[in-house]
């Protein structure tokens, strides 16, 4: 190797070249005389002849040889001739820049990987000599380390390559045959692929899941494997077994001071490092459970009874478990206190694992053998009976022991005479005869009953019956029904009828089940089927949610009925049948949610029974009861209430909110959303908001009509004091007014806004008409409709009248419409103006034709200010003011300033009209805007008269009628764009201010630049000096250029001249485009 390396290293160092020029040197023709080709490639190479045929495969082959030349892939040794060594030297003397080589991306990647590998080797110190850093490790390391696998890092790369991998191990032809078998070593890295393949079988990681870490199915296989290993090791370790036994004993004692043996764990861990093995005590604890569970438990003697049981306090019986196999009991793997079976406040004695769910949670009360001489009743203990029959012997004593408060299962017949307060299960029926009638009532029935009581018809001896089927005594004075009954109780037979009259027992307040018969008390809240009431002193359920059965009468006499009034179910949610009740003092359900049937009442106490305040479903049947003033109707009736008899003297309380059709006996609801039947309504019972069509009311009282009526109401025989709806959107029929005509003279308000057609009625009523709807009785003048004159004296006209008003009324002080867009018909009376009203106002904006019936005595009647039609002639009105802006023919009562009608003597001339010329001298105001040629009087002329005005005061007269003025055309010589010495404004024929008709009148020529020689006042400032005009020369704005140098004309010397000057000397900017 020394000779080879010295030959390479002793070669002269060439200058650095680019990488592409180095690649080009591989593709040069070897026949050419180039030093680089002579050095690198020689004719004795086996693949030198292929370079002349420049096909694709040879190019790829050369690139491959170039890439693997320095990566120790070939097994040829370096020869003495440097030409035979395919070594990539990044630096030649070739100065020509090679063309771009079509190298594949994968080839470029592999070249970069090769450079990276050399750089990593240099950093790791694997390359000993850094004199020639371009020479790869195949030259330096030599052949002392050979590869065992014969492969290379690049050949075994998983990167796809277009070059076959067989070329990696191809040998090159060398001179010495003994060096052909020399292979280049493989460079070792920190993460070698071969080393990773070697440890794949040993370092397989465990698959983690969401399960618990200790999976029993996993450790069963491990345990079998360990047993085989233990059988192979015959001797074993005695210390390990002793330690495990000590651990077991410590676990059973509740002491975990000693840990598992580490030597056994190391042996177990040798098999698999990643297996997280458990020790044998841990596996026994997981598989077999705690030692206290497996160990025998001494059976509790029957004679051993705790003192707490004798005292009556609730206790829990410890379960007796038989001896079982070790492997039979497997407890769950997750637990907090499963090692020692100690009772803690949060953990009691663990029950049997193989027992059923009912047996696990069953805890019954053991009734101890108490002293027979003791007669005191025990306190009720908390017991939960989940349908489990405890076979207990009956105590023969007559004491009254405590019972369970909550009964969730079948009823356990104990020796107690009181039923369970809370019944959640199926309780048996009370069918046995209670022999001891003199027993004191010291216990109560279950308050909550959630089960179905069993019907037990046999009345055998209690000795032969189990505890669950023992019945309670039937004495009603000592037993009460459960407050909450959630089940269906069976028929409860009563044998002691004499005892049923002693004490009043309350029925269950809340009955959630369907009971057939109820012997003692009616529940307050009944959610099921109501049982038959067998006691006359029992109160009905206040809240009934189910269907109550018919109540049976007891055999007691009515005289024995207590006078106490028991309430009926206040809230009835079910359908109750007819109850033959003796104790009629029971109250009716206040909230009735169901359809109640007939309730036969035969007692005078039933007068205090209250009707259901809230009745939701169907229509109840008529209650046959003597009507009383204290009988309450449902306040909120969501159904159709029953019809009361006609014997009701006073008015009952009716529902305020009725959502269904009600009968005639009820008052009209405040909000009626349905169709109500025709009924006799008391006063003040009409609906305020009626969304339907109310029936015809035949009452002679004064009902209040709805304020807002959205529908069409039928005819109502209402009185004069009935208030009409303020806002009426429909078209109600005319209501018949039954009042006298004298009441119509009162002050009556008309509708503010009426958008419909009113009926032509002459009836007098104080009822105002509807707002959006035709009135029924009285028709004041509408706002936006066609009014009909009422016969009343105080009917006011509407402010905005868009229709044609009928003037056949005789109202005295009626005000005309301010904005009347119609032509009112002529009336025969004093409709528009009255004899008595001196402040009558005529139509201000009367677009239509106003009335011609102006009163003769009216002196202050104002005419229409903006009358756009021909108004009627006034009768004898001398100074009546007519419309100021009347564009039609004005009446004789006064002239409209905007009319061209014939004016009277003292009337104003029309403002925009053409009044005929009169000889009168007392014309007040001249026609201000007379466009039709007014022959003016000496009093004043038209201001804007454009046709033939002879008045001197007319400023903008179109033509001049005076003979001494010269009729100069307006736009002849004084046109705008011609040079002139006179102004261009000629409105009144003044001829440019030359002829001045008025001495002191300011002429327009003085204002708009006339010269001083025009005859104007000399002391007036000449505007021509202000606006640039010379003395005596007017300013010509856009005419020909004048001689004055300061004129703003369009001359040749001005800046604004288009011929030359600034604009002529200005160059035009051009867009210069650069050549592209």
Swiss-Prot record:
Ranges occupied by FXFG repeats: 406-409, 422-425, 448-451, 484-487, 510-513, 525-528, 543-546, 571-574, 671-674, 708-711, 727-730, 800-803, 885-888
Annotated segments matching region Disordered: 1-39, 143-183, 224-260, 403-518, 548-743, 940-979, 1025-1054
Positions where Phosphothreonine occurs in the chain: 381
PTM info: Phosphorylated by CDC28.
Basic and acidic residues: bias regions: 426-439, 488-505
Residue stretches spanning the membrane: none
Keywords tagged on the record: Acetylation, Membrane, mRNA transport, Nuclear pore complex, Nucleus, Phosphoprotein, Protein transport, Repeat, Translocation, Transport
Listed GO biological process terms: NLS-bearing protein import into nucleus; nucleocytoplasmic transport; poly(A)+ mRNA export from nucleus; protein import into nucleus; ribosomal large subunit export from nucleus; RNA export from nucleus; transcription-dependent tethering of RNA polymerase II gene DNA at nuclear periphery
Positions carrying N-acetylserine: 2
Region (Interaction with KAP95) residue spans: 1040-1076
Subcellular location: Nucleus, Nuclear pore complex; Nucleus membrane
Sites bearing Phosphoserine, chain numbering: 54, 161, 383, 637
FXF repeats: 336-338, 384-386, 591-593, 614-616, 636-638, 657-659, 689-691, 753-755, 819-821, 866-868, 929-931
Subunit composition and interactions: Component of the nuclear pore complex (NPC). NPC constitutes the exclusive means of nucleocytoplasmic transport. NPCs allow the passive diffusion of ions and small molecules and the active, nuclear transport receptor-mediated bidirectional transport of macromolecules such as proteins, RNAs, ribonucleoparticles (RNPs), and ribosomal subunits across the nuclear envelope. Due to its 8-fold rotational symmetry, all subunits are present with 8 copies or multiples thereof. Interacts through its FG repeats with nuclear transport receptors. Binds to the nuclear basket of the NPC through NUP60.
General remark: Present with 468 molecules/cell in log phase SD medium.
Role summary: Functions as a component of the nuclear pore complex (NPC). NPC components, collectively referred to as nucleoporins (NUPs), can play the role of both NPC structural components and of docking or interaction partners for transiently associated nuclear transport factors. Active directional transport is assured by both, a Phe-Gly (FG) repeat affinity gradient for these transport factors across the NPC and a transport cofactor concentration gradient across the nuclear envelope (GSP1 and GSP2 GTPases associated predominantly with GTP in the nucleus, with GDP in the cytoplasm).
Domain remark from Swiss-Prot or TrEMBL: Contains FG repeats. FG repeats are interaction sites for karyopherins (importins, exportins) and form probably an affinity gradient, guiding the transport proteins unidirectionally with their cargo through the NPC. FG repeat regions are highly flexible and lack ordered secondary structure. The overall conservation of FG repeats regarding exact sequence, spacing, and repeat unit length is limited.
Protein name: Nucleoporin NUP1
Source organism: Saccharomyces cerevisiae (strain ATCC 204508 / S288c) (Baker's yeast)
């Amino acid at each position: 190797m020394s000779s080879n390396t010295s030959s390479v290293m002793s070669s002269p160092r060439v200058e650095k070249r680019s990488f592409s020029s180095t690649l080009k040197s591989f593709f040069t023709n070897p026949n050419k005389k180039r030093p680089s080709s002579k050095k690198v490639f020689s004719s004795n190479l086996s693949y030198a002849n292929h370079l002349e045929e420049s096909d694709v495969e040879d190019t790829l082959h050369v690139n491959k040889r170039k890439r693997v030349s320095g990566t120790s892939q070939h097994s040829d040794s370096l020869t003495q001739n440097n030409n035979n060594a395919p070594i990539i030297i990044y630096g030649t003397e070739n100065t020509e820049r090679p063309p771009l080589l079509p190298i594949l991306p994968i080839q470029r990647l592999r070249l970069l990987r090769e450079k990276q590998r050399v750089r990593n080797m240099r950093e790791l110190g694997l390359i000993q000599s850094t004199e020639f850093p371009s020479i790869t490790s195949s030259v330096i390391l030599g052949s002392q380390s050979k590869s065992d696998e014969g492969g290379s890092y690049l050949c075994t790369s998983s990167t796809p390559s277009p070059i076959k991998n067989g070329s990696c191990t191809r040998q090159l032809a060398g001179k010495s045959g003994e060096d052909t078998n020399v292979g280049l070593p493989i460079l070792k890295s920190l993460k070698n692929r071969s080393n990773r393949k070697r440890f794949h079988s040993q370092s397989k990681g465990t698959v983690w899941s969401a399960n618990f870490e200790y999976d029993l199915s996993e450790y069963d296989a491990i345990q079998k494997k360990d047993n085989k290993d233990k059988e192979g090791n015959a001797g074993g370790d005695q210390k390990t077994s002793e330690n495990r036994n000590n651990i077991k004993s410590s676990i059973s004692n509740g002491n975990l001071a000693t840990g598992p043996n580490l030597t056994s764990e190391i042996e177990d861990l040798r098999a698999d490092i990643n297996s997280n093995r458990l020790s044998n005590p841990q596996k026994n604890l997981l598989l077999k459970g705690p030692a206290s569970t497996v160990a025998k438990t001494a059976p509790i003697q029957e004679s051993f009874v705790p003192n707490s049981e004798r005292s009556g306090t609730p206790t829990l019986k410890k379960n007796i478990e038989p001896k079982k196999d070790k492997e039979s009991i497997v407890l769950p793997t997750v637990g907090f206190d499963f090692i020692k079976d100690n009772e803690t406040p949060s953990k009691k004695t663990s029950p049997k694992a193989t027992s059923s769910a009912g047996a696990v949670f069953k805890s019954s009360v053991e009734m101890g053998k108490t002293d027979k001489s003791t007669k005191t009743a025990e306190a009720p203990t908390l017991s939960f009976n989940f349908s489990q029959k405890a076979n207990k012997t009956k105590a023969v004593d007559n004491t009254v022991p405590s019972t369970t408060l909550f009964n969730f299962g079948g009823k356990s017949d104990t020796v107690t005479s009181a039923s369970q307060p809370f019944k959640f299960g199926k309780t048996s029926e009370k069918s046995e005869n209670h022999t001891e009638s003199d027993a004191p009532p010291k216990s109560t029935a279950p308050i909550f009953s959630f089960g179905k009581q069993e019907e037990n018809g046999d009345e055998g001896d209690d000795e032969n019956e189990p505890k669950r089927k023992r019945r309670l005594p039937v004495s009603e004075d000592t037993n009460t029904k459960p407050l909450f009954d959630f089940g269906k109780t069976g028929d409860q037979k009563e044998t002691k009828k004499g005892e049923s009259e002693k004490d009043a027992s309350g029925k269950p307040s809340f009955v959630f089940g369907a009971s057939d018969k109820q012997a003692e008390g009616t529940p307050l809240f009944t959610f099921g089927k109501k049982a038959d009431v067998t006691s006359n002193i029992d109160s009905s359920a206040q809240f009934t949610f189910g269907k109550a059965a018919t109540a049976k009468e007891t055999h007691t006499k009515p005289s024995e009925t207590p006078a106490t009034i028991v309430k009926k179910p206040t809230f009835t949610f079910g359908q109750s049948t007819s109850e033959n009740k003796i104790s009629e003092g029971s109250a009716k359900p206040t909230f009735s949610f169901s359809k109640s049937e007939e309730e036969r009442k035969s007692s005078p106490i039933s007068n205090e029974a209250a009707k259901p305040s809230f009745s939701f479903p169907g229509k109840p049947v008529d209650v046959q009861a003597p009507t009383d003033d204290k009988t309450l109707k449902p306040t909120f009736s969501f159904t159709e209430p029953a019809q009361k008899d006609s014997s009701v003297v006073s008015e009952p309380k009716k529902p305020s909110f009725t959502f269904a059709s009600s009968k005639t006996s009820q008052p009209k609801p405040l909000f009626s959303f349905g169709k109500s039947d025709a009924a006799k309504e008391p006063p003040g019972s009409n609906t305020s908001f009626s969304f339907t069509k109310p029936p015809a009311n035949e009452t002679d009282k004064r009902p209040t009509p709805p304020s807002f009526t959205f529908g069409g109401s039928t005819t109502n025989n209402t009185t004069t004091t009935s208030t009409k709806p303020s806002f009426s959107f429909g078209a109600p029929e005319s209501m018949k007014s039954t009042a006298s005509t004298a009441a119509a003279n009162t002050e009556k308000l008309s509708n503010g806004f009426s958008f419909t057609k009113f009926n032509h009625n002459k009836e007098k009523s104080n009822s105002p008409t509807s707002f959006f709807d035709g009135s029924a009785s009285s028709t004041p003048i509408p706002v936006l409709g066609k009014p009909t004159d009422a016969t009343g004296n105080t009917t006011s006209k509407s402010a905005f009248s868009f229709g044609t008003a009928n003037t056949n009324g005789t109202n005295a002080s009626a005000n005309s419409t301010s904005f009347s867009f119609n032509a009112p018909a002529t009336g025969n009376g004093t409709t528009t103006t009255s004899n008595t009203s001196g402040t009558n106002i005529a139509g201000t904006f009367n677009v239509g034709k106003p009335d011609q019936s102006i009163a003769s005595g009216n002196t202050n009647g104002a005419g229409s200010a903006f009358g756009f039609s021909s108004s009627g002639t006034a009768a004898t009105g001398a100074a009546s003011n007519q419309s100021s802006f009347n564009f039609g023919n004005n009446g004789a009562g006064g002239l409209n300033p905007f009319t061209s009608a014939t004016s009277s003597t003292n009337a104003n001339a029309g403002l925009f009209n053409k009044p005929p010329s009169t000889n009168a001298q007392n014309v007040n105001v001249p026609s201000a805007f007379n466009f039709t040629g007014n022959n003016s009087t000496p009093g004043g002329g038209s201001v804007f008269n454009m046709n033939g005005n002879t008045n001197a005061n007319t400023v903008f007269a179109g033509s001049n009628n005076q003979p001494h003025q010269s009729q100069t055309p307006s736009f002849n010589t004084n046109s705008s764009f011609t040079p002139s010495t006179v102004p261009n404004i000629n409105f009144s024929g003044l001829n440019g201010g030359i002829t001045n008709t008025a001495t002191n009148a300011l002429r327009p020529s003085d204002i708009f630049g006339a010269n001083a020689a025009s005859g104007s006042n000399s002391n007036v400032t000449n505007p021509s000096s202000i606006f640039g005009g010379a003395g005596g020369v007017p300013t010509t704005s856009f005419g020909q250029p004048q001689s004055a140098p300061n004129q703003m004309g369009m001359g040749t010397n001005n800046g604004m001249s288009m011929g030359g000057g600034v604009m002529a000397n200005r160059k035009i900017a051009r867009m210069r485009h650069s050549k592209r």
